[in-house]
């Protein structure tokens, strides 16, 4: 199924192109911006149409099992060897990679206020602020969580990440991601995933933008198994959208930045690298609207585990143990009878970084605000504050619909280490643990 998937008309700027999409998750897609640009029945003909070059981009080893084998064939104006000159190492700003040991902050439950929108001009690369790192970028295991603050579009600048795939979670303002596979636009309550090695630039759509970014060093995000849930609900494949081909034939000086091995490098090009006229394969960027997620839950009693809200998972080598789970807490009905309905008190082998896109999170009605974040690291207790506990313990148990809310969680098997920015930026709430002070002793051996 194609959505606005007509061939894209050549423009000197991506602003001349209207995004179009193909639906499905992990499909073998094919798309061309000029008729006949895709070869038929073969991948690398002796001579490609329109004088294009054939190039394969592999996201997995050649010998990976068929179900996990990811690659795309790109038909482009110039091969990527023409997109790399002499690289020079450049400043990473506030972007950090694991392992990162910058701060001796004692272990604790942590929560941050949202960062204010800066007044100075910041492109995407300048606006990334790393909050936590986990695992090791050099062993392709773990992740990093970042905030981004963007006040200026990237102009004649492009980027790709060799260290991991990147999930954008907008909280304020829309983004236009101009990738070599096509163009993706996202707004709050949508996400986009850019695979490692894919070149792109970030443009603003309607003013400054703020949001969250997950950098996945491990296995690519995929849909979780549904098990006894069956064939439907949760995130459905048809709601994921991959862009149709769109290209620039633009001979103007451009900078290409590459994140590799935890460092940032830059080279200068005389042309835009967004020059893929056609492509086919299953390794490509995509977007997803979180509002299409179909949650399941308890319709009798008890509060189920939060894993039922998993949208995407990055598996590890241990079955059932995720490198990263991306989990959301969307609008839903709460109907469980004789049940404490908010998330229960918990100590967990996994480490949880949470953010709030909009609304109120039911376990923390105060202090956890849109654009903010919290971190509950492995084996550190957490749960509802006094206000949430009292309300849930004494309220009438009639069906209640949680509306106007969208929280999310990046959960990993690795401990998440806080960066210097996260510890010292002034956003850290030093009174977060006080939210549990009001939980008094209620035990009475004479009152069952």
From Swiss-Prot:
Show the GO MF annotations. homogentisate 1,2-dioxygenase activity; iron ion binding
* Binding site residues for homogentisate: 361, 382
Q: Which NCBIfam families match?
A: hmgA
Name under which the protein is recorded:
Homogentisate 1,2-dioxygenase
Metal-binding keyword on record: yes
Assembly behavior: Hexamer; dimer of trimers.
Where does this protein come from, organism-wise?
A: Rhodopseudomonas palustris (strain ATCC BAA-98 / CGA009)
Active site feature? 303 (proton acceptor)
List the HAMAP family hit by this protein, alphabetically. Homogentis_dioxygen
Q: Which UniProt keywords apply?
A: Dioxygenase, Iron, Metal-binding, Oxidoreductase, Phenylalanine catabolism, Tyrosine catabolism
* Protein family according to the UniProt entry: Belongs to the homogentisate dioxygenase family.
Q: Could you tell me which pathway this protein works in?
A: Amino-acid degradation; L-phenylalanine degradation; acetoacetate and fumarate from L-phenylalanine: step 4/6
Q: Which InterPro entries match?
A: HgmA_C, HgmA_N, Homogentis_dOase, Homogentis_dOase_bac, RmlC-like_jellyroll, RmlC_Cupin_sf
Q: Which GO terms describe its cellular component?
A: cytoplasm
What SUPFAM superfamilies does this protein map onto?
Answer: RmlC-like cupins
Principal EC category: oxidoreductase
User: Residues that bind Fe cation, according to the entry?
Assistant: 346, 352, 382
Question: CDD domains, per this entry?
Answer: cupin_HGO_N
Sorted alphabetically, the Gene Ontology BP terms of this entry are: L-phenylalanine catabolic process; tyrosine catabolic process
Q: Known EC number(s)?
A: 1.13.11.5
Q: Which function does this protein serve?
A: Involved in the catabolism of homogentisate (2,5-dihydroxyphenylacetate or 2,5-OH-PhAc), a central intermediate in the degradation of phenylalanine and tyrosine. Catalyzes the oxidative ring cleavage of the aromatic ring of homogentisate to yield maleylacetoacetate.
Q: Which reaction does it catalyse?
A: homogentisate + O2 = 4-maleylacetoacetate + H(+)
């Amino acid at each position: 199924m194609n959505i606005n998937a007509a061939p894209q008309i050549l423009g000197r700027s991506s602003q001349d192109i209207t995004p179009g999409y193909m639906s499905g998750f992990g499909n073998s897609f094919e798309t061309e911006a000029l008729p006949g640009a895709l070869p038929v029945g073969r991948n690398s003909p002796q001579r490609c149409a329109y004088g294009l070059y054939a190039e394969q981009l592999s996201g997995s080893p050649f010998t990976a099992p068929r179900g996990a084998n990811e690659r795309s064939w790109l038909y482009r104006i110039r091969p990527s060897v023409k997109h790399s000159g002499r690289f020079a190492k450049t400043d990473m700003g506030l972007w950090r990679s694991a392992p990162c040991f910058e701060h001796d902050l004692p272990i604790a439950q942590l929560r941050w206020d949202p960062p204010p929108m800066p007044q100075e001009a910041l492109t995407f690369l300048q606006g990334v602020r790393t909050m936590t790192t986990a695992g090791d970028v050099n062993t392709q295991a773990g992740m990093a969580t970042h905030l981004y603050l963007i006040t200026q579009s990237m102009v004649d600048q492009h980027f790709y990440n060799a260290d991991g795939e990147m999930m954008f979670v907008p909280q304020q303002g829309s983004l236009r991601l101009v990738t070599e596979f096509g163009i993706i636009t996202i707004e709050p309550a949508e996400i986009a995933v850019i695979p490692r090695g894919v070149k792109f630039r970030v443009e603003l759509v309607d003013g400054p933008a703020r949001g969250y970014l997950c950098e996945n060093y491990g296995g690519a995000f995929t849909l979780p198994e549904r098990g006894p849930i069956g064939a439907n609900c949760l995130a459905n494949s048809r709601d994921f959208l991959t862009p149709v081909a769109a290209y620039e034939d633009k001979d103007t000086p451009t900078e290409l930045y590459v994140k590799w091995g935890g460092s940032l490098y830059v080279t200068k090009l005389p042309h835009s690298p967004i020059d893929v006229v056609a492509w086919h394969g299953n390794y490509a960027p995509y977007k997803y609207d979180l509002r299409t997620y179909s949650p399941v839950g308890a319709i009798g009693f008890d509060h189920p585990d939060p894993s039922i809200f998993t949208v995407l998972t990055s598996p590890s080598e241990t079955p059932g143990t995720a490198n990263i789970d991306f989990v959301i807490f969307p609008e839903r009905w709460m109907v469980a009878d004789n049940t404490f309905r908010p998330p229960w008190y918990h100590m967990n082998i996994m480490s949880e970084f949470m953010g709030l896109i909009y609304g109120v999170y039911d376990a923390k009605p105060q202090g956890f605000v849109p654009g903010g974040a919290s971190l509950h690291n492995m084996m550190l207790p957490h749960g509802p504050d006094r206000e949430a506990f009292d309300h849930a313990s004494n309220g009438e148990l009639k069906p209640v619909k949680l509306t106007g809310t969208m929280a999310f969680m990046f959960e990993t098997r690795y401990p998440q280490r806080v960066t210097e920015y996260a510890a010292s930026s002034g956003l850290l709430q030093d009174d977060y643990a006080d939210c549990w002070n009001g939980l008094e002793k209620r035990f009475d051996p004479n009152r069952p």
